[in-house]
Amino acid sequence: FHLLRSFLPGMKAKREGWIFPVLSMAAREAFPGWSGYCASKWALDGMITALRAELAGSGLRITSLFPGATDTAIWDDLPGSWNRGAMVPAREIARAVGFALDGDPASLVEEIKIGPAGGAL
């Protein structure tokens, strides 16, 4: 939110730029025990979806990223036992973002939802 407030005016003035908010599968799915986290992600998704509509035709682009459990160091400090081998490799997230960036300027990948092949962990 604060980054958008800081950078959006300049991006609008230049009529160019790409915003890649990293949300979470928790913005679209309810996870028991994570209600506060889910609520914050649902709210952010709503704000970004509205902003995408507001910016249509402005030259600015927004591609929302909804990663599921991704194998990164963040899991090192979380309590519990996590099957890191079943998580999405971080390089796959990068490949998905690259796909969106390399697309034809006449099209827009609005959302990327990528999660573990076996479902939510």
Segments from the language model and where they lie:
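C-terminal helical subdomain
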Residues: 57-60, 64-65, 80-121
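Active-site-adjacent segment of SDR/Rossmann-fold oxidoreductases
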Residues: 11, 29, 50-60
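Short, flexible catalytic-loop segment of classical short-chain dehydrogenase/reductase
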Residues: 67-77
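Active-site loop immediately N-terminal to the catalytic Tyr-X3-Lys motif
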Residues: 31-35, 86
